[in-house]
Each structure stands twice: as C-alpha cells, then as structure tokens.
Amino acid sequence: MDFEQISRSLLPLLGGKENIASAAHCATRLRLVLVDDALADQQAIGKIDGVKGCFRNAGQMQIIFGTGVVNKVYAAFIQAAGISESSKSEAADLAAKKLNPFQRIARLLSNIFVPIIPAIVASGLLMGLLGMVKTYGWVDPSNALYIMLDMCSSAAFIILPILIGFTAAREFGGNPYLGATLGGILTHPALTNAWGVAAGFHTMNFFGIEVAMIGYQGTVFPVLLAVWFMSMVEKRLRRVIPDALDLILTPFLTVIISGFIALLLIGPAGRALGDGISFILSTLISHAGWLAGLLFGGLYSVIVITGIHHSFHAIEAGLLGNPSIGVNFLLPIWAMANVAQGGACFAVWFKTKDAKIKAITLPSAFSAMLGITEAAIFGINLRFVKPFIAALVGGAAGGAWVVSMHVYMTAVGLTAIPGMAIVQASSLLNYIIGMAIAFAVAFALSLTLKYKTDAE
C-alpha cells in the first residue's frame, strides 16, 4: 500500500492543505479537524484505496483505515499536508468548538468518566465474582477471603466521589487534587455511610440549619456540581489573591468555601437530582417493561450518531451507586443495540459482491460484537441506510428481551461480548439469548431488505 499516494489523494478531497486545521489518529481512524467541513467530499474519500469508511462525528472528519495502517497513513499525511503533529487532546479541543451545547456536555461527561471506567469495571467484575461465591456458598461470609473480596469489590464505589472529583476538576479547569479533597469531604467518616442510612443517621445544627449527616459514597451528581462550583471559586480567587499568597490562601479558601457550600446546599440538591433521575428510569423500566427496552434499544444507535451517548456514563454510575438500585439496567440494552449493528453489518458481507466493501464489513462487524460500533455504523450500515434500520429493529428486539428478563450488569464500560464479564451471574444466560436475538433479527432483516451494496 502506497501511503504517500493515499495522502496525496486525500488532500484535494479535504479542501486542500489550507483547510486542514489539525490531524491526529486513534487505533483505527485518521481524525481531522477541518476549517470548512463543506469542502470535503466524503463519497470520493470513501473510494480511495485503503479507506474503509469516512464519517463526521464530534466535530471531526474521521477516516477509517484500520489498526496498523492508520499510523503509517498519518505519518505520510502530516508530511504531505505540511502540518505539525497534534495530540488527540489538541484535536479534540479544536473539534469541541464545532459541537452544539448538548454534544459539549456529553463530551465533558465522557472526559470525566472514561478515565475512571477501569476502576469501576474492576469493581464490577469483583462484585460478580463475590455474587457467585455468595450464591453457591463457596466461601463462608465470615471467612477472611470473602471479607477481602468484599473490600476490593466495593472500594471504587465508596471513593467514587474522590475519583470523579479529580477528573472533574481537571475538566472544569480547577486543581485536580482540590477536587479529590472535596470528594473526600463528601465521603468523610464523620458522615453516615450512604448504604447504612436504613439503620439511622444523625443531624447537625449549623446556625439554625439542620444538616443531615449522610455521606455521598457512590453518588455522581453531588460531586460533579460541587467540583464545578469549586473550580469557579478557585479561578476567581486566583485573579484577586497576590501571587505571593496564592499557594497558601487560594487552596485554603477554595476548600473551606466549596466544602461548606457542598455539605449545606450542593450535596443535598445533587443527591435529589441523582435520585430523581434514577427513580424516573427505574419506574419506567419496571412499569413499561419490555416496551421501555424496545424503545431504548431501538433508539440507542441513533443517539450514538449524535455523540450524546457519552453522557450516559454518569447516569449508569449513579444507578450503581444508588443504595436502592445498585445495578446497571441500562447497559444491557445498549449492548443489544451494539450487537445488532454487528449483525446488520455481517449481512452486508453476504450480500455484497464488491471486494472493497466485503473487506470492510467483516472486521467492522467483529468490532461491533466487541462493543466498538463506529466502523459498522458509519462505514457500512449508515452508508447503505437499510442495514442501519435493520440494526435499530434488532436492537429494539434485544432490548425488549433483556428488560423483560431483568438482565443487570454490575459495572459500566463493557458491552456486547466483553459485557458478559460484568453481567450478574443469574442474568448471563438471558444476556446471551438477548445478544442472539438482536444479532439474528438485524442480520435477517439486513439480508432480506433490498439495497445496493457496492462502493458506488
């Protein structure tokens, strides 16, 4: 493959060198921020040798080349375009300026939660293991092994406000360590553990205001709002405090002001917001049942196109941290939608006689089955439209099944086949059946519907 030739072919189709604001790449895609998106010819770009798909998302023109190829194309492209290397964060900053307010909020929440997903996934896997140990009586609950497993599985959720405080402060422009400190205040041992409230809690009289001494372990919205407020306070203090006193006074005043406001006002308000969202969703799922799964499973892939799905991490973490819920009933639905995209894409592989399309569909379908759907959605299914519609129907069918069968997950971040690792042991069989339904429905519809499957 001639990477220099690919780069030379790309430039005029992107509006020329002067239209390239920045270039970066991820594992599979060349990510470009263009001065004027209208100058790019997506259809022509898709016909270039080596290009597996092309789409606009999150303010970027993203061209799919695949693992092991994209880095070589990128190296040749920045030389041909005469631009300097950009990090993914720099490209994302430029792209963010093109996003609408909803997409910016979604991107912000994604940047806050993605770094802490490994901790939540680890805890979720350990919770699943602990559940199996408890269900099958492998180890007595008083045994040291059981106690240590319990400690390891719950740790990330107990200190979740501290983890969120750190990453949120970084995104809001505050000091991450002050953000973590504020998260620590909200989970201080002086406050009754949020999961032990049923046994009773005490209140504190603060100048005539009765403050409930309840901790915020496992919560999301209280610390998000509190750290946003803290970052605003910190930035304003830095403007007025002399440099000589900045190191001492700014952290001191920031923590005491934001800490008091968080405990008295923001924390209770954030808890009410989180509980309200959880209540609405759980009520909808419990009362609408499979109809809710049908709706959510069918619409999820449409939401993915907008990029707003990144904001769901916050809601899912809130469900897991809520003592009255403690499970993620949304992620199994999203997983069905992702599997359906893989099924619809796989059907295109059987239908098409175009060698180039055939070369793209198989890896794209496999990627979707692992929970990464961009290549399948933008590279194949949306390109031919009807496979995307088939995937929506498959996602709806799978979503209806997992909701009706009460399939729950114990973490966030993993969907499709990898999601099996964080599914509750009692739900695993129905999760697999749901994937089979989503895949089969999407595959069958995509295979039987009539549409052109060539690169033209």
Swiss-Prot record:
Pfam families the record matches: PTS_EIIB, PTS_EIIC
Domain PTS EIIB type-1: 4-87
Catalytic residues (UniProt): 26
GO cellular component, one term: plasma membrane
Record-annotated PTS EIIC type-1 domain positions: 107-456
Record has ATP-binding as a keyword: no
Transmembrane segments: 112-132, 144-164, 181-201, 209-229, 247-267, 288-308, 329-349, 360-380, 388-408, 428-448
The protein's enzyme class: transferase
Compartmental location: Cell inner membrane
UniProt domain comment: The PTS EIIB type-1 domain is phosphorylated by phospho-EIIA on a cysteinyl residue. Then, it transfers the phosphoryl group to the sugar substrate concomitantly with the sugar uptake processed by the PTS EIIC type-1 domain. The EIIC domain type-1 forms the PTS system translocation channel and contains the specific substrate-binding site.
NCBIfam families in the record: EIIB_glc, pts-Glc, PTS-II-BC-sucr
Name of the featured protein: PTS system sucrose-specific EIIBC component
